[in-house]
Structure formats: structure tokens, C-alpha cells
Amino acid sequence: MKAFLFAAAATLVITALSAPAFAGTPVTLRMDTTDADGRITLGDLFDGVSGPAANVVVAARMSATAVLEAGQVQMSARRAGYVWTNANGVRRIIVREGVDNGGVSSSAAPGAQLAGARLAGAPRANVEVLAYARSLSAGEIVQPQDLIWVKMAGAPADAPRDADAVIGLAAKRPLREGAPVGMKDVAAAQVIKSGDLITITYEDGGISLSLQGKAMAAAAAGDVFAVQNTLSKKIIQAVAVGPGAAAVGPQAQSLQARSQPLRFAAR
């Protein structure tokens, strides 16, 4: 009888030792978290999730982006048998409209599919990234309240280190809430539109002259643009000074030189 009990106990110990650990399978957060159908799944969020668990829905995306609490995502992964340690202390995960499971659409070129596969397997490192707190229309000026710092898996190559670098600049195209900020997204705000009637001034050594012209292109302060003299119809190059105003001559050269750092940073 004692021998039987000893054998049974040994069997239980061996079974317990051979059972998979409760911690589950480790996974890593994807560098670019996107989904295509509004159903955010574990497969959309993590590398290393496979089988039915990849289709477990964590949340729904009702707009262009969705913001998920990292703790809730972590619990969802654990319930499915996966562990995300979140060693970098991510607080929120931003999921944007894109493709499912971090891949590419079936219509994408083979080269794009290969690039997507390489990206999915790249090393991950979460960092603080400046993102848009709301969606902006093209031409809209970026205000301090339009920016927030969030944790993301990676930052754009042209990500600004300081919010002051983009505050006061204009969106070059529609920008989505939650998207990371890149300097290529913005440019100096346009002060002159194509077709505007403007005043062109020339100042040098106490001499001041002015004439009326028609802007042949849009321009931001400090930009060189073409202007047509409304009397002679000749085209000249001037530097935008402000709304409805441009300059030529030494004054224009000085204004252009001062604006160079700003325009370089906005590219």
C-alpha cells in the first residue's frame, strides 16, 4: 500500500513538473499596430501569437485610430495563454487603420510583402513619441493642445524631440489623431495664396519704393516666390514678408536668410 501511494505521489510530481508553465508563451508588441476591419485582435497587436488566439478580439476601432490601455491588453493576452512583460512600461497602445496582423494586403506587390515580413520581425523598443491629440486638416496650424507624448514601439526618423519644433507650423496634409508627429507632416504656415494681390516693397539706404503685384504661387514667410507686376506684367522674384506683403532687394535677402533654419527644419 505504501509503495502504491509513493508511486502515485511520484506520478503527480512528474506530471506537475512536465506541465507547461502558467506564465504562458512570451510575445512582443508589434512596431506598427494596425488593423483593417475595426476588430483589434491579439494578432494585430503582438508578434508570436498564432492559431485561434490570433483572432481573439481585444477592442473595436470606431474611428481612424483607437487608444488601448496597456494593462487591459496585457490581461487579454494572459487569458489567451500569452505573456507580454511590457518591460518598457508602455501605458497606452495606439492602433491605427491599416492592415490586419501587421502584414500587407493581398493585393500588395511581392516586394512589399517581403518588406512587411522583415519589419514584423525587427527588434522592438518602446519610446516616448510626440503624437497628435486630435485630427488636423491640411493647412491647419498646430497648437500646443494638439500634441501629446505617448509610448510607442518606435518613432519616425524625423520625429521632433521638442513640441516647440512643430507648434505654429501648418499641416501639409490631413493628419490623424494618434499618429506620430514627423517634421515632414508640417511646414511654415502660408501667408500668401496664389492669385493674391500684394504690396511689394524695396528698401535700401533710406530709399523706400512699393508697387502692386499678383502672387503667382503660394508662399510662407521667408519663401521666395514669383510675383507679376500688375502694370508691366513682368514676373519678378520676391520674398514673402506677411499676409499681402513681399519684399525685394537687401531687405528680402535678410528676411530669407533668417527664415532658412525654420524652413530647413520643416522639410
Curated annotation (Swiss-Prot):
Compartments, as annotated in UniProt: Periplasm; Bacterial flagellum basal body
Coiled-coil residues: none
UniProt note: phenotype after gene disruption: Cells synthesize a flagellar basal body, lacking the distal P and L rings.
Pfam families in UniProt: ChapFlgA
Gene Ontology cellular component terms for the protein in this record: bacterial-type flagellum basal body; periplasmic space
A GO biological-process term: bacterial-type flagellum assembly
Keyword Signal applies: yes
Superkingdom in the source lineage: Bacteria
Key words of the record: Bacterial flagellum, Periplasm, Signal
Signal peptide segment: 1-29
Principal place of residence: periplasm
Subunit structure, interactors included: FlaD is a subunit of the flagellar transenvelope basal body.
Function: FlaD might be the structural protein of the distal basal body ring P, or it is necessary for the assembly of the P ring.
NCBIfam families found in the cross-reference section: flgA_cterm
Record-given protein name: Distal basal body ring component protein
Organism: Caulobacter vibrioides (strain ATCC 19089 / CIP 103742 / CB 15) (Caulobacter crescentus)
